[in-house]
Amino acid sequence: MRESSQIRETTETKIKLSLQLDDGKNVSVRTGVGFFDHMLTLFARHGRFGLQVEAEGDVFVDAHHTVEDVGIVLGNCLKEALHSKEGINRYGSAYVPMDESLGFVAIDISGRSYIVFQGELTNPKLGDFDTELTEEFFRAVAHAANITLHARILYGSNTHHKIEALFKAFGRALSEAVERNANITGVNSTKGML
């Protein structure tokens, strides 16, 4: 099974995270940031991934360090779980509607970290979650996993719905990208490596 478990401990956070790419039965998320827990759970469920997260952070300051560090550890686990990247689709994309909002995510498991994030988040805070941390999370994942990630909110009026559409689209796009494909021999690249 393609899986990884890692712990990251700094003076600001302690993150324990396990990711299973091929078994989505076990999802348990506790970061101390309720809205973020909800989004990570949606990502795992819609990607059909197993995900267990236990995070302690300096949320008395704000949620920035916790959200960013969870993104870093998730990216590290994704990179480790994929190993050589042989036989996977490599690319994945998904449009996901959430009522009046539409989110889009495209992913390339390229070995090159890059992110494009586009979207207007008009409500600056959802519970204890600063909505600008949405981009910070995706940036942390992309850089740690060495993937190219495009995330875009096409339209919508409800900030919760916009972010939810993105996290669901992220799960679905990543699921497609990491899916094993019997028609692919080696890695899906003319270079012979990713």
From Swiss-Prot:
The molecule here is called Imidazoleglycerol-phosphate dehydratase
Q: Pfam families recorded for this chain?
A: IGPD
Taxonomic source organism:
Bacillus cereus (strain ATCC 10987 / NRS 248)
The UniProt entry's sequence similarity note says: Belongs to the imidazoleglycerol-phosphate dehydratase family.
List the subcellular locations. Cytoplasm
Q: Which HAMAP family match?
A: HisB (MF_00076)
Which class of enzymes does this protein belong to? lyase
Q: Which domain of life is it from?
A: Bacteria
Please list the reactions this protein catalyses. Answer: D-erythro-1-(imidazol-4-yl)glycerol 3-phosphate = 3-(imidazol-4-yl)-2-oxopropyl phosphate + H2O
Does the record's keyword annotation contain Lyase? yes
Q: What pathway annotation does it carry? A: Amino-acid biosynthesis; L-histidine biosynthesis; L-histidine from 5-phospho-alpha-D-ribose 1-diphosphate: step 6/9
Query: What one GO molecular function would you report for this record?
Result: imidazoleglycerol-phosphate dehydratase activity
Catalytic activity, EC: 4.2.1.19
Its taxonomic placement starts with: Bacteria, Bacillati, Bacillota, Bacilli, Bacillales
Among the GO biological process terms of this entry, one is: L-histidine biosynthetic process
User: What gene name is given for the protein in this entry?
Assistant: hisB
